[in-house]
């Protein structure tokens, strides 16, 4: 995609944000566990339910951006500040998608697993659109990039470590708040779905990326 076509880039990247946000909402609805990066906002929302998942999401992203400033110092570029509007947009999109699915009833484990698998596919497509748009960048991914550059450890290793950190912190908070590592009992944030999303989203992208790229070439 041509870098000089800013409108198209932002449209594609924004479409990616919408799809990823819908994936977050689907994973929460499945009640089998959400993606590692969404675990802290989801757990905090269970304890402080007056504050939405989306609000906790953008708050977490702002903290991640501040951590980048600390790590990079003067090397922190002004262009990185575009993560701030991306954080707000993504947070409110998460809330909107959660609201859209509020009346959906999931009563069987089979249906829960179907939603989990659908979340993997949807998230893979959304992430590819974000990357293809080369406009918005969410703080989770950018923080992993910065950590990789600063530590000189591979991005994949850093990403896995960051995911594990998010899950562990969320599980510890859940244990302290609810006496359970997975959630408040009725609402599950960390379970097999978390592992499925962590392991298989990247693998799914190997299949969906060529299809998304082919579609983008036709449309754009």
Question: Which residues does each predicted region cover?
Answer:
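Core subunits and conserved enzymes of cellular information-processing
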Residues: 2-220
């Amino acid at each position: 995609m041509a870098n000089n076509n800013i409108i198209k880039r932002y449209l594609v990247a924004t479409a990616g944000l919408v799809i990823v946000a819908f994936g977050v909402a689907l994973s929460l609805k499945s009640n089998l566990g959400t993606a590692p990066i969404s675990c802290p906002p989801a757990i905090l929302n269970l304890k402080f339910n007056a504050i939405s998942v989306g609000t906790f999401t953008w708050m977490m992203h702002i903290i991640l951006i501040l951590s980048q400033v600390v790590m990079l110092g003067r090397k922190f570029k002004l262009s990185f500040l575009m993560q701030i509007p991306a954080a707000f947009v993504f947070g409110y999109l998460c809330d909107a998608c959660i609201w859209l699915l509020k009346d959906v009833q999931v009563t069987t484990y089979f249906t829960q697993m179907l939603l989990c698998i659908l979340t993997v596919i949807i998230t893979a497509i959304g992430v590819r659109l974000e990357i293809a748009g080369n406009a918005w960048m969410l703080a989770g991914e950018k923080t992993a990039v910065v950590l990789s550059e600063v530590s000189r450890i591979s991005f994949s290793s850093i990403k896995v470590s960051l995911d594990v950190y998010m899950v562990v912190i969320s599980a510890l908070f859940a244990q302290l708040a609810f006496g359970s590592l997975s959630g408040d009992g009725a609402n599950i944030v960390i379970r097999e779905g978390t592992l499925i999303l962590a392991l298989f989203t990247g693998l799914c992208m190997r299949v969906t990326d060529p299809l998304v790229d082919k579609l983008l070439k036709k449309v754009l």
